[in-house]
């Protein structure tokens, strides 16, 4: 079997790894082995966090909806329950966008949800006893 010299291929491989690890700190951007290890970790973190990002956005939307709902004297839980009872199919992303950009429309949705909710006997009344 013929001998294979890897000089050019090895140089190209090292160059691509070092180019990809340009912004890393210390040896991780200068030494091939450290750069390769860091690149493996970085790709793993990127893969993991692309999935985690979806949950983080959902948390953000829920906290925005809750803040806007409480400004309209209803909790997030009761708002979602009322919207489901009223048959309004709007996802949390669009609901959060409405809460931020169009408060009047959000208030209208809150009124629809409030009308669809059954009257809660344990809820405190508006009158002082």
Curated annotation (Swiss-Prot):
SUPFAM superfamilies: Ribosomal protein L20 (SSF74731). InterPro entries: Ribosomal_bL20, RIBOSOMAL_L20_CS, Ribosomal_protein_bL20_C. One of its GO terms (molecular function) is structural constituent of ribosome. Gene3D superfamilies: 6.10.160.10, Ribosomal protein L20 (1.10.1900.20). It holds the Pfam family Ribosomal_L20. Keywords: Ribonucleoprotein, Ribosomal protein, RNA-binding, rRNA-binding. CDD domains: Ribosomal_L20 (cd07026). One of its GO terms (cellular component) is ribonucleoprotein complex. One of its GO terms (biological process) is ribosomal large subunit assembly. Binds directly to 23S ribosomal RNA and is necessary for the in vitro assembly process of the 50S ribosomal subunit. It is not involved in the protein synthesizing functions of that subunit. HAMAP family: Ribosomal_bL20. Belongs to the bacterial ribosomal protein bL20 family. PANTHER family: 39S RIBOSOMAL PROTEIN L20. This is Large ribosomal subunit protein bL20. The lineage of its organism: Bacteria, Bacillati, Actinomycetota, Actinomycetes, Mycobacteriales.
